[in-house]
C-alpha cells in the first residue's frame, strides 16, 4: 500500500534553487570544509610561510519528521486507486512543506534542523537599492560564486516589487522575477518578510532512508479504520555560512 513514487525533491523550492540533496544516508555524516591555502610573496632566499588552510566539519544527523493518519476502511475500499494517489500527493506535499518551512524558518526547534533565518534581526527601515547592492558586495568579498539566487517570502516579494530603485527611473527593485539581475524564487515557507540570497549549492539537505510508511490495521480496527504511520529523517545545514546573506525586511 502507498508505494510513494513521486520524488520529494521535485516538491522543494530549495532544490530549484540548487541545494545539494543527499539521499540514502546512514548514521551521522560529517562534510569537510576547507578554508583554502594561503600563499605569500617572499624574497629570493627567504623562508616560506605556512600556507595551510584549516579544515572544519559540518555535521548532519537525522531528525525525525512524523505523523499518523487514521483512514476509514470504507473510504479505502470505495476507490482504492484514487484514495492511494490522493494520499501519496498529500503526504509528499506535507513533508516537503514542513521541511522547507523549518529550513527557511526563523526558529530553533528541538529535534529539527535549525532555521536559516534564526537570529536574523528584522530591518528597522525600508530596504533600498543600496542595501541590495550591499548584499551582493558581501558575497563577492567572501569570494562566493556560482549560481546565485534569491529565495524570498511572498510578503518580501511584494515589498521588493513595490520598492522604487530611485526617484526618477520608474523602475522597481524586483522586475521580471529578478532582483539586481539575480533570479528570485518565492515560497511561503520563508518566515515573515525573509530574504535569503546566496549560492544554494552550499546548502546541504540530507535524507536518511526513504519515507517510511507503516500500515497498522489493528489499533483502530474496532472503529473501522486503518492507521498509517509516517516517518522520515532529515537534516539541513549550510556547508559555508558565508555563502548566504539574510535579511528580514521592515
Region locations from a protein language model:
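Acidic/polar, low-complexity extended loops/arms that serve as protein-protein interfaces
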Residues: 1-145, 172, 185, 237
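Extended oligomerization regions of viral-like shell subunits
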Residues: 107-235, 240-246, 250
